Amino acid sequence: MPRSTARAAWKRELAATLALGLPLVLTNLAQMAMTVTDVIFIGRLGSQALAASALGANLFTAIEFFGLGLVAATAPMVAHALGRRGNAVRDVRRTVRQGLWTAVIYSVPGCLLLWHGEAILLAIDQPPELAAQAGAYLRALMWAMPPFLGFLVLRSFVAALQRPRSAFLIALAAIVLNVFGNWVLVFGNLGAPALGLVGAGLASALATLGLFLGMVGVVCLDRRFRRYHLFGDVWQPDWQRLAEFWKLGLPIGAATAFEVTIFNAAAFLMGWLGEPELAAHAIAIQIASVTFMIPYGIAQAATVRVGHAYGARQPDQVARAGWCAFSLGIGSMAIAAALMLLAPGLLVSAFLDIGDPANAQVLRLATAYLAVAALFQIVDGAQVLGAGMLRGLHDTRVPMLYAALGYWGVGLPSGAALAFWAGWRGVGVWSGLAIGLALVAVLMMQRWLRRDRVGLLRRA
């Protein structure tokens, strides 16, 4: 390929990745905003309600994110079918329908566990009063799981067709619905009973149902999606495609669960160190979570772009799609890392009154954690981008093993050893997380570089 032609191909791919990735990033941030609005309303109920909601949310997240990873198989399977062309409409329809089946199937045991949330929290030695409140909250919030997983399936479908803007607009509308629902149900406005923490859970469930119904409306009414007839005979079982879906999705779900639960475990370690450490950790992890949404959205775009090229059997395009996404993601995280190093006080001030002398210790600790998080950003971005690129090649089992090794085999033990044995305390916990993420990032990128040698490109 002539140099000018190659340069033009790279520019086109970079533009396509950005056009797909930006709406996905914004959709992820909008979904985070729903959680933030819940915290704001619950905070007005008092510190005990806030603590109970945090307990419940941690359990909900651990269970929900396995399902999130499971239904994430939708994007690479749909993208591969579209790239391969052939009988793409039928293949896409089969995959999306079985994605919706998977959302329902997983939600049954997931909701059953959440229904018994109080018993689970008591079993891990949480305070009985907080466990009771968290249990009631979870019995309301659990109804958000089925529509949320269904929304993710349909969002993956429209993203694979490279039309992600509708999902972002629906997510914005869901934020408004969530705020209104909290105002009505938490405090008892417009004649509704004041349900407090339970009302916040119900508001989230209703807003999430709105997310799903909005996406159903889009795929049924928009002519670009309507031709796939996703909901015709949706209850007809397709056991072969369902098995293929779970074969690809189960390792994604496990890897996602490994990552989410290590952060939950890190919070427990911080709790053992003391209240200031836990408060500073909560602030730093919230900042890191916001910036993580950028490479996470770009990684979702990478799965689609790589998946299209993989289905079309275009190895050069596979490389371009992967490296363009990687460059965009790492570039964004480098900017985030610089901001954490140069202006930590500005970032912390969004969550804490840094002028209050009573907050001086938390400010000092949060600033120290953000210094470690600057490195954390680069490797966290690299691992999620690597996972997204490999996912486009339908490579999920080995990345799952990398995640288990890096997070639980190295990251958490390193963090505990540095915190308690070496005396680094909270900085040790964060350093352990960074070490684990760095190992996963190196392993993911090494596998991507060896994709042809290990036979990933020959499976299309």
From Swiss-Prot:
Keyword Signal: no
GO cellular component: plasma membrane
TM spans (from-to): 20-42, 57-79, 100-122, 137-159, 166-188, 198-220, 250-272, 282-304, 325-347, 362-379, 400-422, 427-449
Keyword Transmembrane listed: yes
Job description of the protein: Multidrug efflux pump.
Family statement drawn from the similarity comment of this UniProt entry: Belongs to the multi antimicrobial extrusion (MATE) (TC 2.A.66.1) family.
Protein name: Probable multidrug resistance protein NorM
Source organism: Bordetella bronchiseptica (strain ATCC BAA-588 / NCTC 13252 / RB50) (Alcaligenes bronchisepticus)
Biological classification of the source: Bacteria, Pseudomonadati, Pseudomonadota, Betaproteobacteria, Burkholderiales
Recorded name of the encoding gene: norM
